[in-house]
Amino acid sequence: MLSLNQLIGAPLTALGGILCLRWWIFWRRHYRGKLITYGPYSHVRHPLYASFLILVLGLALLITIPETLMLLLITLAVIPLHIRGEEEELLKRYGEAYRRYMKRVRWRLIPGIY
């Protein structure tokens, strides 16, 4: 019998992994040095980080050991810091185009939350 953690953690881990892979394929096909605002970037401004967070959350539920909980906590602490620095760089690089994008795609990581 599967535990509740396994029933939730396994699909989240798979979903996060699939989303990371889909992001990578999208990025390889579309990035040419210009700001991308379509595809997964039309939902959140940092789709790779969102995918990775889903993956790590799933792992923390699926493999209930202190190390995966620590990985989740570190991920939750580091991703927002990294996003902040990355967005400063994107504003410098793309200027007003990135500002318009930020207004249009309000959520950095999790729609409706952050």
Model region roles, listed by residue range:
Residues 3-114:
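Cytosolic-biased juxtamembrane loops and peripheral soluble domains of multi-pass membrane proteins
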